[in-house]
Curated annotation (Swiss-Prot):
Record-stated family: Belongs to the Clp1 family. Clp1 subfamily.
Function: Required for endonucleolytic cleavage during polyadenylation-dependent pre-mRNA 3'-end formation.
Keywords associated with the record: ATP-binding, mRNA processing, Nucleotide-binding, Nucleus
A Pfam family hit: CLP1_N
Compartment(s) of residence: Nucleus
HAMAP family, A to Z: Clp1 (MF_03035)
InterPro entries from the UniProt entry: Clp1, Clp1/Grc3, Clp1_C, Clp1_C_sf, Clp1_N, Clp1_N_sf, CLP1_P, P-loop_NTPase
Name of the protein in its database record: Protein CLP1 homolog
CDD domains in alphabetical order: SIMIBI
Source superkingdom: Eukaryota
GO MF annotation, one: ATP binding
Organism encoding this protein: Drosophila erecta
CC per GO annotation: mRNA cleavage factor complex; tRNA-intron endonuclease complex
Length: 423
């Protein structure tokens, strides 16, 4: 569908305008002409023009009715009156009740998890709940446990940020000063023991940090989770709920998961089944891969509105302190006395540079030694291996910071790869 000269869309109360952009060079401009509207919980400013590009899947909702002016090339564009936004705002109202009680009694605010299979709108619901909380003066923490399609850090990591202002309509939440823990894989199943250890550590630190500010303490935490909800994936959800002490679990679009959680979580935990929005779009494997790639590209190069200019520099093998968490499995009979096979899953092992290292993203740990708690230490940032020269015994790194690497820099291997073809 092509909208070359622009068009006004009149929305009735409790309806939303949905559109998708798939063409690479397409650009869609939206402005609020009259009334009130919001995008995933962020209010639109009247007469201000918002720009959306390729990959955008937008749903602009109005509680009272509005007129929107839209111009540009869209693949899909329609108005829907079937929207779960009223149920989502009811969830916010319930959480706000918990926050008011926590404020009165000087206790931790609610910890709410959003769970469900892939492509049901989990991160969107998190964004809505966080935006609504901020709009009534709260300062919640946002924890993202989705290592496949993270919304705070690049894939292969879990992360937490403090939300102090509503998400930017075009770019989402500010990613300033996130707390990031390295996992190194795109699925928890690659190393379940390590994933649980990393989640437990981040939960411990996040819950402790609630005490640093009275407003944050009563505001609580919103947690986004992976879309793997069966077998070991379900066990990871239970582990996260226990580690964070979740008091509410919002289940999107899966009755089976809802009933399993009702059966398995403590009686005091509120489990709520919610419908997914009709605007949620299923993504193919290729689209997921592209989204991961785009996140890494933005980490190093920024975007059109705020470009970054990363550095490339050489590091000799002898100066490279490179490790991987998790050693190949061994049978119990081959393990040292007192060690179990699963201990290998959290072992920090040295990595010898080879040409296979090219394109891999490496995490820079705040740990200075492998004697430290490497798993329980957050990371400072990331770099990418763009070249491996076996003859010169050196690697070329793409980094947001200029040379040299920090003294005692400890780099952690990740299975995430990024082809740096930026020109």
């Amino acid at each position: 569908m092509s909208e070359d000269h622009g068009k006004d869309y009149t929305l009735e109360a409790d309806s939303e305008l949905r559109f998708e952009i798939e063409h690479k060079d397409a650009k869609v401009l939206v402005s609020l002409v009259s009334g009130f509207a919001e995008l995933f919980g962020t209010e639109l400013v009247k007469k201000k023009q918002y720009e959306f590009g390729v990959g955008a899947k937008v749903a602009i909702f109005t509680y009272q009715g509005c007129v929107l002016h839209v111009s540009g090339k869209m693949d899909v564009c329609y108005i829907s009156k079937e929207t779960p936004m009223v149920q989502y705002v009811n969830c916010h109202t319930a959480l706000e009740q918990f926050r008011m009680e926590a404020e009165e009694k000087d206790r931790h605010g609610p910890v709410a998890m959003v769970v469900g299979p892939m492509d049901v709108g989990k991160s969107t619901l998190c964004r809505i709940l966080l935006n609504y909380a901020v709009r009534v003066g709260r300062r919640p923490l946002y924890a993202d446990l989705d290592v496949g399609q993270g919304s705070i850090a690049i894939s292969g990591n879990v992360a937490t940020i403090l939300i102090e202002r509503p998400a930017n309509v075009e770019e989402g939440f500010s990613k300033t000063a996130p707390l990031v823990y390295h996992f190194g894989h795109k699925s928890p199943g690659a190393n379940s023991i390590l994933y649980n250890a990393v989640v437990s550590k981040m939960a411990e630190v996040t819950l402790h940090s609630l005490n640093s500010n009275k407003r944050t303490k009563s505001s609580g935490i919103i947690i986004n989770t992976c879309g793997w909800v069966k077998g070991s994936g379900y066990a990871h959800l239970l582990h996260a709920a226990k580690a964070y002490g979740a008091c509410a679990i919002f289940v999107l679009d899966q009755e089976r998961l809802y009933n399993e959680l009702l059966r398995d979580v403590p009686k005091g935990v509120h489990v709520v089944l919610l419908p997914k929005s009709g605007g949620v779009v299923e993504r193919s494997k290729e689209q997921r891969h592209e989204a991961r790639d785009q996140r890494v590209k933005e980490y190093f190069y920024g975007n059109a509105r705020a470009p970054f200019y990363p550095f490339s520099f050489e590091v000799k093998f002898q100066d490279l302190r490179l490790y991987k968490i998790g050693a190949p499995p061994l049978p119990d009979s081959c393990m040292p006395l007192g060690m179990k096979a699963e201990d290998n899953k959290t072992k920090v092992v040295a990595v010898t540079p080879t040409p296979a290292l090219i394109h891999h993203v490496l995490a820079l740990s705040f740990s200075e030694s492998v004697e430290d708690d490497v798993i329980g230490t957050n990371v400072a940032g990331f770099c990418c291996v763009t070249e491996v020269d076996m003859e010169r015994q050196a690697v070329m790194l793409l980094s947001p910071q200029p040379r040299p690497l920090p003294p005692n820099a400890l780099l952690l291997w990740s299975e995430l790869q990024f082809m740096d073809n930026h020109t």
